[in-house]
Each structure stands twice: as C-alpha cells, then as structure tokens.
Swiss-Prot record:
It comes from the Bacteria. InterPro entries: PRTase-like, Pur/Pyrimidine_PRTase, Xanthine_PRibTrfase. Keywords: Cytoplasm, Glycosyltransferase, Purine salvage, Transferase. It comes from Parabacteroides distasonis (strain ATCC 8503 / DSM 20701 / CIP 104284 / JCM 5825 / NCTC 11152). 5-phospho-alpha-D-ribose 1-diphosphate binds at A127, Y128, G129, N130, A131. This is Xanthine phosphoribosyltransferase. Homodimer. NCBIfam families: PRK09219.1 (NF006671), XPRTase (TIGR01744). GO terms for molecular function: xanthine phosphoribosyltransferase activity. It is found in: Cytoplasm. Belongs to the purine/pyrimidine phosphoribosyltransferase family. Xpt subfamily. It is an enzyme of class 2 (transferase). HAMAP family: XPRTase. It catalyses: XMP + diphosphate = xanthine + 5-phospho-alpha-D-ribose 1-diphosphate.
Amino acid sequence: MELLKQRILQDGRCYPGGILKVDSFINHQMDPMLMYKIAEEFIRRFQDRKINKIVTIEASGIAPAIMVGYIMQLPVVFVKKKKPKTMENMLSTVVHSFTKDRDYTVCISNNFLTPEDHILFIDDFLAYGNAAMGMVELAEQSGAVIEGMGFIIEKAFQDGGNLLREKGIRVESLAIIDNLDDCKITVR
C-alpha cells in the first residue's frame, strides 16, 4: 500500500534492536483518514473470504479492526491482555510482547469466539508472530476458523510472517519492512 509506505518513510522512526516507531500516525496518535484507507485495503485483500467476525488484540489493533468491522458491518472483538473480574467462560493463552519484553496471559470470552466464527485477525505489527500465534491457539481452543490475518506493518527480517505462512495461514501485510539496519528504514 503505497500511501502507507510513504507515511512510514516520512514519519516512522527507527530505534536500535529492530524497533520501528509509528506512534505519530498508527498506534498512539492515529490518522483516521489513513486508518480508513488501511481498512479498505484489508477488505479488498480478503474479499474472497467468508468472514463473519473481526478479531484483534488490545490495544493497537483495535483502531484498524474497528474500521474494518464498521465498513464490513461485522462485529469486532478484541483479545484482552488482562482478565477482567467479570469474565467467565474464557479461553486463554500466554503471549510474549516483543516491544514490551514481557509475557501476557491473554483471554477472550468463549461467548465471542465460537465454532461458528470465521474470523479475520487484524493487528498493527507482525514481528516474531507471538500475538498472532496466540490468536491461532485461541481459535483452536474455540473451534473458530481463521480466514486470514492482516497486518498494517510486517517486519520481514523477523520470523512471524514465515511462521504463520508455513502453518498455511493467509497473511496480508500492507507494508513490509525488509530491514532496519543502522536505523535506516527499508520498505519492500
């Protein structure tokens, strides 16, 4: 997605350790017009799939997931990083956050992820694939079918994309970063 690539090159910032910061337009301050275009592109790429629910993980995946759900007129559910006291009948798994370097026990109500669901998982980044693999585990627990996974940005120099594709999951990334060596952003 050319508009997104240009925005990453213009406003993205690189930090040592393979970190790309896009907080000025994606995951802290958001550009709603760009987010709308991102949602339209995800919908275009997955138009051949029979999807009945959009799923993401809190927090940075919520905005693009809501946009996709709004346009497709589908419900959106997000996997929580902390179990609420009021949640019963939950599915859970452990996910490691690359950015925050910590483990989370993520959870989702089995009322909102069922064997009848054909889901599109949306998230901001695909790096090592930890959040996405957590979603795979939750889908397996629930019996839901993952129709595809859409990521705003994929870091191709980390293993997540290959891991998911090797599992036979349809992955669509709108911008692919080939490397961040010497803090120079190289977009495919």
